[in-house]
């Protein structure tokens, strides 16, 4: 992908040179105030004559994150990984803007839910997808990348490969890499068992060349951190989690399933 310098009003940055899209529509969406808000940004998907675009605006002083996502997306692509194609990136003072083309494919959670249907064929396909997930995360780390927030919604499954979304906190370097395994594993997912979670870790450990002792140490560490995150996020007392055990804590449809707990409270 080739990029050229771009400026409009007080915006300065780069745009894709050979892709048709409406810059004015994207800027209007960025300034419109709509979309999903997160801690550092606001995201909005918009329909255009050229397809779906994702507009992510970063209020001051977090505009540097837009440039980081742009740079990391290109670095990932150069290393053989799939990431959304940036159409437009810019700064306005200390605010930032990132516009990407829709990555296509299927959300990881949607793919797993689809493969949770009964039947030996579906079960085999689900297990294969989970093994591929562990192997791909290992490949990411081996290439020197650590994703900033590798939760399932930030992964797409497209044409037999994973696409890494939201790369504004992705960085190079090994320290903290195993945290990605905690981010992936802390979600309660329909149709995913404790054995399925272990399958991801085994594939990861195998691809990283870990021996049995190091594999067991990694698994125990990831399990402890997942339990701690569940307790912190969902306000589960540590003593309650310890009594219930990991399987019950992470079982879809179980007493600690956040979806069921929310429904009961409603």
Feature-to-residue mapping (PLM):
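Conserved ATP-binding subdomain of kinase catalytic cores across diverse folds
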Residues: 18-113, 120-121, 132-143, 147, ...
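Conserved protein kinase catalytic core
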Residues: 62, 107, 155, 172-173
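Short, glycine/acidic-enriched loop or turn micro-motifs at the edges of active sites
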Residues: 104, 152, 169
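Short alpha-helical scaffold element within the canonical Hanks-type protein kinase domain
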Residues: 126-130
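Hydrophobic residue at the +6 position relative to the catalytic HRD Asp in the kinase catalytic loop
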Residues: 150-157
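Conserved metal-phosphate-binding beta-hairpin within the catalytic cores
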Residues: 157-163
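C-lobe/activation-segment region of protein kinase-like
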Residues: 163-228
């Amino acid at each position: 992908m080739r990029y050229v310098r771009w400026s409009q009003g007080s915006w300065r940055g780069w745009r894709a040179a050979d892709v048709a899209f409406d810059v004015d529509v994207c800027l209007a969406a960025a300034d419109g105030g709509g979309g999903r808000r997160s801690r550092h940004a606001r995201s909005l998907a918009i329909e255009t004559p050229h397809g779906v675009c994702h507009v992510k605006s970063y209020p001051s002083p977090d505009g540097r994150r837009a440039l980081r996502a742009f740079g990391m997306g290109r670095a990932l692509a150069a290393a053989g990984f799939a990431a959304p194609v940036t159409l437009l990136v810019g700064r306005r003072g200390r605010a930032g803007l990132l516009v990407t083309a829709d990555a296509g494919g299927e959300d990881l959670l949607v793919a797993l839910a689809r493969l949770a249907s009964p039947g030996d064929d579906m079960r085999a396909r689900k297990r294969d997808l989970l093994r591929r997930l562990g192997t791909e995360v290992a490949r990411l780390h081996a290439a020197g990348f650590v994703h900033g927030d590798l939760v399932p919604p930030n992964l797409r499954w497209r044409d037999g490969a994973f696409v890494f979304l939201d790369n504004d906190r992705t960085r190079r370097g090994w320290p903290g890499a195993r945290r990605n395994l905690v981010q992936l594993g802390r979600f309660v997912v329909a149709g995913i068992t404790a054995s399925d979670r272990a399958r991801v870790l085994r594939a990861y450990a195998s691809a990283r060349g870990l021996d049995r002792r190091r594999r067991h140490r990694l698994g125990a560490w990831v399990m402890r951190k997942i339990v701690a995150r569940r307790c912190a996020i969902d306000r589960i007392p540590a003593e309650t989690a310890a009594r219930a055990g990991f399987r019950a804590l992470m079982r879809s449809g179980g007493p600690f399933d956040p979806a069921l707990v929310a429904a009961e409270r409603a």
